[in-house]
Structure formats: structure tokens, C-alpha cells
């Protein structure tokens, strides 16, 4: 009777923590979206879609620590299986539960990215065109969404028939081990199709991480440390600029006081000056509001705390940088090479974050908290990067992300980007802590011969405890389903590996750029020349 009770208690503990995190995630997503959505253009369907999409992404990341916890808690610290996990069928049943969770969440992600979010986006675009016919709006939105459905179907079809064949010039021993690990996951064509589609989305997420997260990791802490410019100084500077522009306008208008028309060049200069004057007046209104804003006054009082938080964030960013560099260097030196996706079993170089997670894992849920903090850190730094850069398509800026003034379409774009970014964080966390993500804190028993001077006693051996790695017997270590899901296709792992190097490079560039920039304005991003009057009035009133 003890075995089922122990099994139930271990499972309930892991899933109870997951449920608590789930509720926290839902609350966070609601507050996050409500903070940035436009107050006058808010749309119920786009708000709900954005909240659900972001929640699904974060929940998927929250499942990773549960996966690691379950494979780790099957064993005692001495390397033996616990009584309730001694049966291989029981272990498979537990891991299948996690696998079904990944199946469900990844399927929902595909549904959101390729069907639901595009449909809501195009539906709102049709609404913007003053189309009051609901049926026609739905019809046109579905027409545009079909293209995304075709892409999704193509990815699923390709994933179904892409074989996991051995690439040329591979290390046969390593590759045989890789094949065995994937056989553990099963050979279902449905799984292969889903894994291929998710890996394709993760590639897009990798590009978003390289673009937004790498820059955000440098700009967020440095902005906290540097702070903002003084509101009083900015108002004085804005007043002086306004007076100077008004003098230039009066000077140009004086040229036509006697009825003579202005030249083409003067008319163009006059128009530019009037536009600049309008922008300065708007800046003045925003600065006046900022001066009266209680939040800015509280922020000034909390300045020391912001500096400490900025120092903490930059230290965390540097820790990630060093850890990722060591992990990539380890793969370059000790993996089977590009032909196997730079897959490596265990760690050969000391990895600080991996060691920290392994140390915290036995005291559950400390490792769960740390993984959640890492995921949230990626989200916050990604959001900082997106807000500073905006949403771009090549060299064209599509949308700006600003508190209480973000359009519904921009919110949908924002959540899709964050969804893809969080999707890629599963591989990023593996890169930061490969041993932890693959095996958790599992250990196994190894028989080693004892040296002896007496030939008749040469068969004596001792049992030692080792951390699970590729050399462990097949029935002694269980690999997390997350690792297998993300590494089923070796060529994706190869691209992820080079993407990590690009991430490190962009982070260094962003760090240099952020250091060279001065303090940002207290109304940074609130007033731009290409803003509409409607957008400005929404903020002021």
C-alpha cells in the first residue's frame, strides 16, 4: 500500500506547485496586457486572445521544471530507484503524463500562431475599415487566415515524412545513443510532425530572442542604473526650444508681410518649423502631466532601489553571458560536431548556472522558483527590447509598444513575439544548464574493479555513485521529455547552436550602445513626430 501512496504524494507535490504557478501566470498575463492596451481602442476579443496566448507560452515553460522534478524524484540521492518507481512501467506512465502535457500545450501554440491570432488580427483590421457587416468581416478574416493554415499544414506534412536518419561522417557511438534516446520518446508520425512544427516556430523565436531579448538584457539594467532626466530641466529646455522655433517662424512670416509670396524653400522650412512647434507643444503638455504624476514622484524616492535592481539585472545578464559562452565552448570542444547538432551529454567544463540548479534541485521547489525567475527575466528583458525598438518588419516599423496606448493589433503582435520567445527559452535554458535539463539530479550506481596485488582477488569491485550521463546503463537514467521533444531533429539543434553565438554578439553590441547613450527622457517614447493626434489625446485626457 506504501508504493501507490508514495507515488501519489510525489506526483501531487509536483503538480500542486505547477497549479500555483499556473494561477500566478494567469494573473501576471492579465495585469501585463491591461497595462499596455489602449484605453480607447481596447477590444474584448483581442484582449482575451493576447492574455491566453501569453499564458499558454508561460505555462509551457512552467512545465519544464515539473518534467525535471519527476525524473529526479524517481531516485534516491544514492542512485537507487525509490520503491514506487522501481517498476519501469510506472516510470513510463509518469513520463507519458508529462508528454501528453507537452502534446496539448504545443498543439494549442500551433492553433494560436497559425489560426486564432491571425484570425483575430485580420478581423480587427476589417473592423478598422468601417465594415459593419459582421459576416463579411469574418469571411475576409478567414480568407486571409487560410494562408497561415496552409503553412502549418505544410510543416506538419514535412515533419511526418522527414526521417531521423544518420547524417554522414558522424561519430557512430554518439549517434547510436541519440537514436536510442529518441526511440524512448516513440516513433509516432504525429509526434514527429508536431515536433518539426514547434522546432520551426522555435527558429523564428530564436530570431526574436537575438533581436529583442539580447538588446533588452543590456538596455533594461542600464536604464535602471542611469535613471531619467529631470522633469524640471526638460520643461525648461522644451520652453527654450519652443521660443526659438517661434522666433524662426516669425522671421519667415515677416518676409511675406508686404504681400510677397514665400519661395518654395521658405515654405518648406515654415512647414517643418510649424510641425516641430506642434511637437514641442505636445511635449510640453506631456512633461506637465509627468511633473504632476505621483508615480514619477514615487519613482524618484525609490531611485536607490532601482539602482540596486539594475546592478542585479546586469550581474544576472553577465552570468547568462558567461554561462552560455562556456556551454557553447563545451559543445564546440566535446560534442560529436555539426553533423549531430552539437549534442553533448553532460558537462565537461564547469558551468556555474548548471551547478547552481543541481545544488538547488533536491530542495524542491527552489529550482522551480529559479527556472521561473529565469523565464520571467527573459520576458521582461524581451519586453524592454521590444518597447525600445518597437515591432519592425525589416526596416519598416509597424507598431510602437507604449503603456495604455498600444493598439489591439500591436498587442497581438507583441504576444505572438513573446510566445515565440518563451518557446525558444526552453532551448536557451538547456544551453545554460544542459545537465540539469537533460537528467535533473539523477545518479546511478556503477561497479568499478578494485586494484589488488593478489591475482585470485582480481574480481573484487566497489559500487560508486555517479551523476547520470551518456555512459549510464539504459535502464538507470531517465531523460526528460522536454529535451527529447526539442532535439528530435539534429539540424534544428545545429541552427540553435549558431544562434547562441549570434545572441552573445548582439548582447555585446547592445551593451556598448546602451553605455554610450545618455539618460532617457522621463516621457521617452510618449511623443513622436509620427504620432497621431488621437493617440496623443488618448494619453492626455
UniProtKB/Swiss-Prot annotation:
Topological domains (Extracellular): residue ranges?
A: 1-11, 72-101, 167-189, 328-365, 431-488
Q: Name one GO cellular component term.
A: plasma membrane
- Protein task: Lysosomal membrane chaperone required to export cobalamin (vitamin B12) from the lysosome to the cytosol, allowing its conversion to cofactors. Targets ABCD4 transporter from the endoplasmic reticulum to the lysosome. Then forms a complex with lysosomal ABCD4 and cytoplasmic MMACHC to transport cobalamin across the lysosomal membrane. May play a role in mediating and regulating the internalization of the insulin receptor.
Please give the name of this protein.
Lysosomal cobalamin transport escort protein LMBD1
Q: Does the keyword Translocase apply?
A: no
Q: Which InterPro entries does the protein's record reference?
A: LMBD1_LysCbl_Transport, LMBR1-like_membr_prot
Q: Which organism is it from?
A: Danio rerio (Zebrafish)
The alphabetized list of GO BP terms reads: insulin receptor internalization; protein localization to lysosome
Q: What gene is behind this protein?
A: lmbrd1
